[in-house]
């Protein structure tokens, strides 16, 4: 039987979030709805989840000693990684000492870089993937591009939101792609993956929840990427029954291998009735923000329930829905959003502004959420609302 304490009391149930972005912010809110005490950690001050947590700390989460000291100080019941750039060897050590890492320290360690998860998926589990090769110097990189063939996709083994990712369409782009990958890695320059270009009809995220009662799947989410970063997502993505069954089988295999409880974002390419595994994140997924309006329980509420060992008897889709990322370009420490009365005049439409304190280049600062009788109409509505939004730097 699950017992939850009350926040800010001696018997509080405590969760430490490692990473405090917009996805973590929603998880914090859902945990607090259940009376949980939340500590938010990030590498910079006033990150979105820190703004709503009970307490916050600013450290380099790649510093294992600093991370260990903080965990020993707070002694949380659950450690919940929200980003890849964490000293995962320290998480393994903490788990061995009796701390609970969500979903597991192994899952966090394997998925923190693309090499660990790709080798697990393709070489151990035999899941269908694109052709690939890992390299750590420019000479081997050129050879890998020749072996894989053009076009091909280049990614740092450790990055998020499309940073460092590019597509090589001609041989004269090889140096540029290498340099961009070296600049975009979360932990600095280093190893990259060269992937064969996959011909596909569409991409999906199959959110998969491992919980006390078993494994459950959300309705598939379609999405559009730009430079490796999500721009729009919608739910449900129409797909054949055969393709959906195959996608669920792939998701079941990879999440079972990772273990633990919580939500996983399993990314796949779909071509006809065939599915190809791409990546998996052992945490809520950015494309899954659409569930804030499409479902009775969002991916964040489901994650909170799964973490705490609470049941998830069913997952209900309210209606077709879409999300449109608000990406701000420029340089500012005082971004303002205007004309919101017109944005929210669209029925069954909402907006989330993440509270990120600055932008330097381009950054996702919010999301428009819309519901309608079809995915197409929901997308149209989200775009209409977005077009009315005023952004002032």
From Swiss-Prot:
Keywords, in A-Z order: ATP-binding, Ligase, Magnesium, Metal-binding, Nucleotide-binding, Purine biosynthesis
GO molecular function, one term: phosphoribosylglycinamide formyltransferase 2 activity
Superkingdom, taxonomy of origin: Bacteria
Record-linked Gene3D superfamilies: 3.40.50.20, ATP-grasp fold, A domain, ATP-grasp fold, B domain
Positions contributing to ATP binding: 114, 155, 160-165, 195-198, 203
Reaction it catalyzes: N(1)-(5-phospho-beta-D-ribosyl)glycinamide + formate + ATP = N(2)-formyl-N(1)-(5-phospho-beta-D-ribosyl)glycinamide + ADP + phosphate + H(+)
EC id: 6.3.1.21
UniProt similarity note: Belongs to the PurK/PurT family.
Assembly notes: Homodimer.
Purpose of the protein: Involved in the de novo purine biosynthesis. Catalyzes the transfer of formate to 5-phospho-ribosyl-glycinamide (GAR), producing 5-phospho-ribosyl-N-formylglycinamide (FGAR). Formate is provided by PurU via hydrolysis of 10-formyl-tetrahydrofolate.
Protein name: Formate-dependent phosphoribosylglycinamide formyltransferase
Gene, per the UniProt record: purT
């Amino acid at each position: 039987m699950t017992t939850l304490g009350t926040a800010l009391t001696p018997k509080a149930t405590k969760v430490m979030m490692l990473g405090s972005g917009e996805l973590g912010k929603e998880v914090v809110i859902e945990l607090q709805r259940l009376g949980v005490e939340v500590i938010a950690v990030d590498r910079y001050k006033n990150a979105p989840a820190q703004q709503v947590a009970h307490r916050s700390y600013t450290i380099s989460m790649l510093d294992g000693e600093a991370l260990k000291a903080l965990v020993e100080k707070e002694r949380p019941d659950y450690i919940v990684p929200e980003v890849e750039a964490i000293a995962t060897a320290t998480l393994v050590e903490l788990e061995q000492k009796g701390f609970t890492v969500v979903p597991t320290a192994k899952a966090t360690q394997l998925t923190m870089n693309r090499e660990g998860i790709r080798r697990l998926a393709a070489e151990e589990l035999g899941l269908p993937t694109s052709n690939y090769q890992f390299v750590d110097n420019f000479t081997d990189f050129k050879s890998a591009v020749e072996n894989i063939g053009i076009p091909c996709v280049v990614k740092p083994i450790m990055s998020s939101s499309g940073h460092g990712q590019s597509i090589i369409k001609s041989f004269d782009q090889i140096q540029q792609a290498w340099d961009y990958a070296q600049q975009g890695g979360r932990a600095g320059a280093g190893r990259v993956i060269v992937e064969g270009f996959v011909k596909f009809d569409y991409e999906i995220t199959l959110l998969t929840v491992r919980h006390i009662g078993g494994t459950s799947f959300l309705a598939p989410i379609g999405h559009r990427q730009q430079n490796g970063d999500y721009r729009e997502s919608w739910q449900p993505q129409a797909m054949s029954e055969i393709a959906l069954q195959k996608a669920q089988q792939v998701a079941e295999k990879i999440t079972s291998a990772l273990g633990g409880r919580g939500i996983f974002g399993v990314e796949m390419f779909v071509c006809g009735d065939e599915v190809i595994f791409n990546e998996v994140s052992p945490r809520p997924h950015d494309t899954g923000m659409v569930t804030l309006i499409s479902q009775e329980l969002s991916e964040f509420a489901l994650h909170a329930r799964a973490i705490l060992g609470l049941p998830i008897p069913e997952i209900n889709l309210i209606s077709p829905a879409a999300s449109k990322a608000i990406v701000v370009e420029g340089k500012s420490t005082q971004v303002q959003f205007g004309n919101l009365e017109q944005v929210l005049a669209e029925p069954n439409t909402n907006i989330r502004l993440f509270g990120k304190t600055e932008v330097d280049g381009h950054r996702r600062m919010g999301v428009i959420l819309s519901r309608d009788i079809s995915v197409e109409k929901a997308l149209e509505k989200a775009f209409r609302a977005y077009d009315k939004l005023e952004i002032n730097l």
